[in-house]
Regions:
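N-terminal leader/targeting segments and the immediately adjacent pre-domain N-terminus
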Residues: 1-95, 118-123, 363-436, 445, ...
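A small/polar active-site loop signature that marks catalytic segments
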Residues: 158-233
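Active-site-proximal alpha-helical segments within enzyme catalytic domains
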Residues: 196-203, 241-264, 314-331
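Active-site-proximal binding-pocket segments
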Residues: 216-217, 221-280
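Substrate-recognition/cap regions that form aromatic- and gly/pro-loop-enriched pockets
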Residues: 432-554, 560-567
Length: 618
């Protein structure tokens, strides 16, 4: 196996075996806290949909369908026409004005930087990347390498085999990319690879002496009034380029509006018209369900339209013929353009749809649209069931044999009074449980892997009821995450992951499962990210708890991303030996990964000396 495959195998193995800690990539805290106090600059003018030629009823129907679909998990939506915001909705618990991870949507911004660099005559499309970085590859190896140009990186046709999975293999991503093997002839086949974009970012740094973020701040972000953003770097200090950017929805809309305006903003030409033209042209066909690829952006279904696209639902859709921009942030379970969310949007803006210049104002329809957005923002229009039944598989775990019937009765009785959750809170308050398996983190695996911020493992969970507020505390490594829990509406909190602070909103519900066992259901939303932690805590009669962990988007996405690796590992003798079995099949490996992604663990009461003093009676 190649070095990067070995590294991925090692990561997967450590997860399966329950090992905590870091990877082969050096970790350093870099994410700043969200700048709440920063003044937002250059906000768009707000207008009614009708004043810009579109019905409020259309947006109301679109938002209802996006919210109701079981295949979508909407976070933010914004629509602009003629440079004015005509619809905006933030789905609970995601607040207005909060930055959001963009994933690959930011590739299009890196493409803009390359266009600027070419306009400044510091770079050419046909330059060989091996000539740009002569010190990163030895002369002998270079003789046998094909020419890979800047344009090949822009169109995802480099053929380089070092891809996203390789970033866990070490700190030198640029060197690994330049020395990796090449599949086929560069420029002939579309092979989506985020490391192509990373190398484009490295080229900006090589030619300017600045990181991509530093280069773009005075040329793009500053002129657009974009002040609330952060872009991660690799261990070598190179901006990731193809992922790792946090950006607000309205600022995403500015980047779309900039292209609608042919690169001009407030009278200043930020991106050349030539680059707008060439980057938004289809340079090659792509897989089924998509419409072609330009320079770091995708073509859309509507003729002349295009899109900045990031996985799980981060999109800026530009419709030049309608002078319109749509922005989405979501946590869908799908990649790229062939997804339910975009198909719903295409349904409301089909090829034959042509909005009017202006429509008569409709105060009633507009009022209903605003009410709907308010309900969605407050979580009052949630069409998704939170029922336990049929959604969580039961796992067999060992149980301790001590019992406290009085405590168990009080917990059970409290759940039987759904109108009085305070009795349940009092029943569990002050109790701390020690985890028998201590390798699970508060952050979803998506967050841990994408930010190279791996868990130290949760060792204890405790409950506190104080002054009418309920808290669940998770002891992870040396840090205690004390999260306020809201019932009916998520409560805001924060977790500290090795010096990086992530804002969360925690929603709770007391219920019983199909076996009549009392359960506390927690949904911990990482509001700057695409993901949620789902934690179900079952209170058993033996005075212990069982905790079932899940995340969304979860198992399906993670297993799909690891499919090629697990298939190869299943037949690898060394890997089988490490797992203690010389006949590990792909099916068994997938089952082990499923249990790793959705574990069930047991906790036992740390001290029961206060049990008899707990009183849940009114």
């Amino acid at each position: 196996m190649a070095k990067e495959q070995i590294a991925v195998a090692e990561l997967v193995l450590n997860m399966i075996l329950g090992k905590t800690g870091g990877t082969r990539v050096d970790y350093f805290p870099q994410k700043p806290d969200f700048p709440f106090d920063a003044v937002y600059e250059q906000a768009f003018v707000r207008a009614t949909p009708e004043s810009q030629g579109i019905s409020s009823d259309l947006f109301a129907a679109l938002l209802r369908e996006l919210d109701a679909s079981k295949d979508t998990e909407m976070h933010h939506f914004m629509a602009l026409r003629h440079g004015k915001v005509i619809c905006e909705c933030n789905f609970a618990p995601y607040p207005k004005g909060m930055w959001h991870i963009t994933h690959s949507m930011c590739k299009s911004i890196t493409g803009m930087a390359i266009g600027m660099l070419i306009e400044e005559e510091k770079l050419k499309l046909d330059e060989n990347i091996y000539d740009i970085f002569p010190d990163h590859i030895n002369a002998f190896s270079k003789i046998f390498r094909p020419v890979i140009t800047v344009e090949h990186l822009l169109t995802m046709t480099s053929g380089v085999t070092f891809n996203e999975s390789g970033i866990v293999s070490g700190n030198d991503w640029l060197g690994s990319f330049l020395n990796a093997s090449v599949n086929g002839k560069p420029g002939t086949e579309f092979q989506y690879n985020s490391l192509n974009t990373y190398v484009l970012s490295a080229i900006v740094t090589k030619r300017t002496g600045e990181t991509l973020t530093e280069y773009l701040t005075p040329r793009l972000f500053g002129p657009l009034g974009i002040t609330k953003y952060y872009w991660e770097t690799c261990p070598k200090g190179i901006t990731k380029g193809g992922w790792g950017l946090f950006l607000c929805a309205e600022d995403m809309a500015k980047l779309g509006q900039l292209y609608l305006q042919r690169g001009k903003w407030n009278g200043q030409q930020l991106v050349s018209e030539y680059w707008i033209e060439i980057s938004t042209a289809r340079h090659l066909k792509t897989q089924n369900g998509t419409y072609g690829y330009g320079y770091q952006l995708w073509m859309e279904q509507r003729p002349g339209s295009f899109e900045y696209n990031g996985m799980l639902g981060q999109n800026v859709i530009i419709y030049p013929d309608m002078d319109m921009v749509l922005v989405t942030n979501a946590g869908n379970k799908e990649m790229f353009q062939d997804c339910i969310m975009l198909n719903i949007i295409r349904k409301y803006f089909p090829v034959n749809y042509h909005p009017a210049d202006v429509l008569p104002e409709n105060p009633l329809s507009y009022s209903l649209l605003k009410r709907l957005c308010g309900e969605l923002e407050n979580g009052e229009n949630n069409n998704r069931s939170t029922s336990l039944r049929g959604r969580w598989k039961r796992n067999v775990v060992s149980r301790r044999k001590h019992s406290d019937k009085k405590y168990s009765y009080r917990i059970s009785a409290a759940v039987d009074r759904p109108s009085d959750h305070h009795s349940f809170m009092r029943a569990v308050s002050g109790r701390t449980y020690v985890m028998e398996q201590q390798n699970i983190g508060i952050a979803p695996l998506f967050v841990q892997v994408f930010h190279n911020n791996m868990t130290d493992g949760i060792s204890e969970i405790s409950f506190t009821y104080d002054a009418g507020n309920f808290y669940v505390s998770f002891t992870e490594g040396e840090v205690i995450h004390k999260l306020p829990v809201g019932f009916g509406r998520a409560a805001d909190g924060c977790v500290d992951l090795h010096g990086e602070h992530y804002l969360v909103a925690t929603l709770g519900e007391f219920a019983r499962d199909e076996n009549d066992i009392p359960v506390l259901k927690l949904e911990i939303t990482f509001i700057e990210e695409c993901v949620k932690r789902k934690v179900h805590i079952f209170f058993h009669e033996d005075n212990g708890i069982e905790i079932r962990w899940n995340e969304t988007p979860g198992k399906k996405m993670i297993l799909a991303g690891l499919s090629s690796i697990t298939e190869e590992l299943s037949g690898n003798f060394l890997y089988n030996s490490l797992l203690g079995d010389h006949n590990i099949t792909t099916e068994l490996l997938h089952r082990l990964m499923e249990q790793t992604i959705e574990p069930a663990v047991r906790g036992y009461l740390k001290s029961s000396k206060e049990t008899d003093s707990i009183d849940t009676d009114e």
